[in-house]
Amino acid sequence: MCKLFINAKSEMWASHTRSLRIDGMVTSVRLEDYFWRTIDEIAARDGMTAPQMLTRLYHESIDAGHDLGNFTSFLRVCCLRYMHLQLDGYIPRDKSVALGDLNAEKILAGESRIYH
């Protein structure tokens, strides 16, 4: 079992920092390359760049009343949820399907039945 993880390309867990501007303030986010690739994929599905999506995600999270004391951890969980929702069949693996076109309420209801 461990060989599957140990022998993966080490570039996947190499960390990289990207800077983005949120409300006029420059902030840096440091994530492993595998998470950045996932964020790029999520953003592209809705016709956005990663900085555009992260800014939007930040604002919508604040508007929803979330405490984003650790935005980087929040992003990692978002990436993992995205992949799990694909595996569970709630998000199509077809990258041409925009996430914004999906029925979020239905997906969240299905997810809550699985991960309660």
Q: Which residues does each PLM region occupy?
A:
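Short Lys/Arg-rich basic patches
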Residues: L4-R30
